[in-house]
């Protein structure tokens, strides 16, 4: 549907311009129109809901107006296959995973914000009135009030209803579509330089996927990908303006693309847009077009851009105020692990994570050394490509490379490392394109030796680019579809039962639970988080789950619904909450207003010990403070048997204790852990394994395989339960945890968030601990029991 809508809008823009667009640019121009229109209509609440029908009707009008062209036009096979191939490459990690999901999970939390914006803006525009305090509301307010660019997001939102899917499951195909349109624009830029269409298509296919573009695509960076595509499109569109016989309105496609760039990334696009517009103006003047036509064209361009960019201009002051520090601070890294190497712009980076220096071996060769060799080859080839373009007066390629480099240098002089990374990514298709032009220049020579050398040069650059893509595919972090889908079902099931609290660190919780006014207590967007932490507890840390025992009782009681990640070591909610749902990964508890709220709460247990025997002095103090006739309630639960991977007999090389989770190991490559655990009493147990798993991890007890985990990336401190239950005897049991070797499956490499945590044996099934209730006067009876907590209740 996105292709059809973009195609129809491209034909409509063509009609408005009164010129015939190059066939390969119809869809990219239509996509630009979709971005600009959706940004405009979603600015106001009154027009937001009309966005989808409006763009569909406009696309239909475009097909009707351009019907004659469509009837006489065939499919231009080479660029079409190049774009389809790029789409397939960028979509491969999701498609070959077998699940509709998205990439960049645990790598870039901003994707959750994009999901929120897409849903909210298409229904209510930028109006947040009526939203109660929650992480959902706080995140939206923070971004919308700051003038955050939303054009590329709402373009997806405009067509999402046509798919009937949650935005999370169509997000990655949209990013792949953006890069496919980049390939079409690159094909157009080299039209006059590379005569053979199949050569041109091969060059566009490779140049559209330099390592940084792939890396940003596989972390969900929607604005940056849109900018890379728009910059190439602007250059491709500026060439036809030089013709003297073009009507004044011929600038409309360029203006629409310019407005799309502003909608996609805001005023930050000006280092690219302004020079391109200046080139168009100078080129028009050089063609001896009358000054009246020059002024008229400039006026039409400025007018179209101004109207379509009203939302951006209206929020300009807020945007400048909020982004000044983020863009220019020398210490702002965003999600980077350090400043990127400028040579990464060459398009080759043999690391599964573009943020890391290549550190593996490839076919027995050192990846870092091989990277530098291939980067050097690409740079040498780029000089050949530039020289050939100059000799052939291929001005579009020279303009594209020159402006991209100048804009990148400008951003890197004033920008933060975070902004520098974006600029390097945006320039990388231009760098890769001119490097790939080098072999094409040489292959046209007369000598056989030079043609053979051209082939070797082209293969080396192609191998570097495709090798970088393959490594990124192997280390991609895919979101756990089934778990997040369960969270979405809970959000729909509990709609209207808010406010809700979730204690897991799950940045996508605020999207999937949006109908229940969710608050993630350890989120970056957590209202009144200062009131959450219990004095003397472990506190609330961003990026980590929080146990209910570490929260103030009054804070927890604010919420009607609790959405809790299932865990063998998590505390039971207060006694006035009852469980209303149990799934594979989550439980839902609802406050029962028919039960009196606890007057006081004595937390017990810590870390992997969810319960302990209370000190009699503490129970006595609780009893003394209780009103006459009160009750003491306490869940009984034993300490669960456990095996700590950090205490294994031997830890494999490449595995080490996680810096932020001292009871877990960061794992890389194949390995096994051996040890023992002791079970105090025979019975049926559920096996839980902490960690975040990409490739399969198996668990064996006494030489028998009992569980397998895989495709379950997760945040810190969380557990996954093995299906079914185990019947085990009392005593010592041998434990073996094995992580196998890699495969060709996406995400099967050693990317981010691969951890192995404690093995816990919990009670079989989903039964909750029995809550013991005794009169205050019988408080001593609780001192000898293993308890989760003790609460005081009015009778």
Question: For the regions a protein language model found, what residue spans apply to each?
Answer:
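Membrane-embedded, hydrophobic transmembrane alpha-helices
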Residues: 1-80, 558, 782, 788
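Short periplasmic/luminal acceptor-recognition loop of GT-C membrane glycosyltransferases, typified by
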Residues: 462-468, 474-537, 559-567, 589
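Transmembrane alpha-helical segments
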Residues: 264-269, 312-315, 413, 438-441, ...
């Amino acid at each position: 549907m996105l292709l059809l809508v973009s195609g129809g809008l491209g034909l409509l823009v063509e009609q408005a311009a009164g010129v015939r667009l190059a066939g390969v640019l119809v869809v990219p121009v239509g996509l630009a129109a979709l971005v600009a229109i959706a940004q405009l209509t979603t600015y106001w609440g009154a027009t937001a809901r009309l966005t989808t029908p409006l763009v569909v009707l406009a696309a239909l009008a475009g097909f009707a107006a351009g019907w004659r062209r469509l009837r006489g036009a065939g499919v231009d096979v080479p660029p079409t296959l190049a774009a389809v191939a790029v789409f397939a490459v960028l979509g491969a990690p999701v498609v070959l995973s077998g699940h509709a999901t998205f990439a960049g999970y645990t790598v870039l939390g901003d994707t959750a914000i994009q999901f929120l914006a897409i849903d909210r803006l298409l229904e209510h525009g930028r109006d947040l009135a009526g939203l109660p305090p929650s992480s959902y509301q706080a995140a939206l307010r923070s971004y919308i009030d700051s003038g955050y660019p939303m054009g590329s997001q709402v373009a997806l939102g405009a067509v999402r209803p046509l798919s009937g899917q949650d935005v999370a499951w169509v997000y990655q195909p949209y990013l792949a579509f953006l890069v496919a349109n980049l390939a079409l624009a690159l094909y157009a830029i080299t039209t006059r330089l590379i005569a053979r269409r199949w050569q041109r298509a091969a060059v566009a296919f490779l140049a559209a996927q330099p390592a940084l573009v792939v890396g940003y695509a596989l972390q969900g960076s929607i604005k940056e990908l849109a900018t890379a595509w728009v910059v190439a499109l602007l250059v491709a569109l500026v060439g036809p303006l030089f013709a003297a016989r073009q009507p004044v309105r011929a600038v409309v496609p360029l203006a629409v693309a310019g407005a799309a760039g502003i909608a996609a990334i805001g005023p930050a696009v000006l280092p690219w847009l302004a020079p391109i517009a200046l080139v168009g103006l100078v080129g028009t003047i050089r063609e001896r077009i009358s000054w009246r036509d020059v002024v008229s064209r400039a006026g039409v361009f400025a007018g179209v851009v101004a109207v379509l960019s009203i939302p951006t201009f209206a929020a300009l002051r807020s945007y400048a105020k909020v982004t000044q520090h983020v863009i220019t601070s020398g210490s702002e890294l965003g999600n980077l692990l350090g400043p990127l190497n400028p040579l990464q712009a060459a398009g080759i980076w043999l690391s599964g994570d573009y943020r890391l220096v290549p550190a593996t071996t490839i076919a027995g060769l050192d990846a870092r050394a091989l990277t530098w060799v291939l980067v050097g080859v690409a740079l040498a080839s780029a000089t050949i490509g530039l020289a050939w373009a100059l000799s052939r007066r291929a001005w579009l390629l020279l303009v594209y490379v020159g402006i991209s480099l100048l804009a990148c240098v400008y951003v890197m002089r004033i920008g933060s490392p975070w902004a520098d990374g974006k600029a390097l990514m945006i320039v990388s298709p231009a760098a890769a394109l001119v490097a790939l032009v080098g072999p094409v220049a040489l292959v046209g020579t007369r000598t056989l030796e030079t043609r053979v050398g051209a082939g070797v040069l082209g293969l080396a650059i192609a191998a570097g680019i495709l090798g970088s893509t393959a490594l990124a595919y192997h280390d991609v972090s895919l979101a756990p579809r089934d778990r997040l889908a369960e969270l979405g079902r809970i959000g729909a099931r509990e709609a209207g039962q808010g406010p809700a609290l979730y204690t897991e660190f799950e940045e996508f919780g605020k999207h999937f639970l949006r109908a229940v006014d969710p608050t993630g207590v350890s989120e970056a967007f957590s209202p009144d988080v200062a009131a959450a932490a219990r004095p003397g507890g472990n506190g609330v840390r961003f990026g980590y789950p929080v146990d209910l025992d570490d929260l103030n009782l009054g804070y927890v009681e604010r919420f009607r619904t609790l959405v809790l990640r299932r865990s063998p070591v998590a505390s039971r909610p207060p006694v006035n909450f009852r469980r209303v749902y149990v799934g594979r990964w989550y439980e839902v508890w609802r406050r029962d207003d028919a039960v009196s709220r606890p007057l006081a709460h004595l937390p017990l247990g810590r870390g992997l010990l969810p319960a302990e025997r209370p000190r009699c002095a503490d129970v006595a103090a609780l009893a003394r403070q209780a009103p006459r006739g009160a009750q003491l309630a306490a869940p009984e639960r034993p300490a669960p048997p456990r095996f700590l991977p950090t205490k294994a007999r031997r830890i494999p090389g490449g595995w080490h204790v996680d810096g932020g989770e001292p009871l877990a190991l960061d794992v890389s490559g194949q390995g096994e852990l051996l040890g023992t655990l002791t079970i105090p009493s025979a019975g049926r147990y559920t096996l839980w394994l902490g960690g975040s798993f990409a490739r399969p991890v198996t668990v064996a007890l006494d030489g028998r395989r009992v569980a397998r985990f895989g495709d379950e990336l997760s945040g810190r401190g969380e557990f996954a339960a093995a299906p079914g239950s185990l019947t085990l005897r009392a005593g010592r049991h041998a434990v073996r945890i094995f992580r196998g070797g890699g495969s060709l499956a996406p995400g099967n490499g050693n990317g981010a968030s691969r951890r192995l945590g404690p093995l816990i044996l919990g009670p079989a099934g989903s039964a909750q601990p029995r809550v013991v209730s005794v009169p205050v006067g019988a408080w001593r009876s609780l001192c000898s029991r293993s308890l989760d907590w003790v609460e005081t209740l009015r009778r």
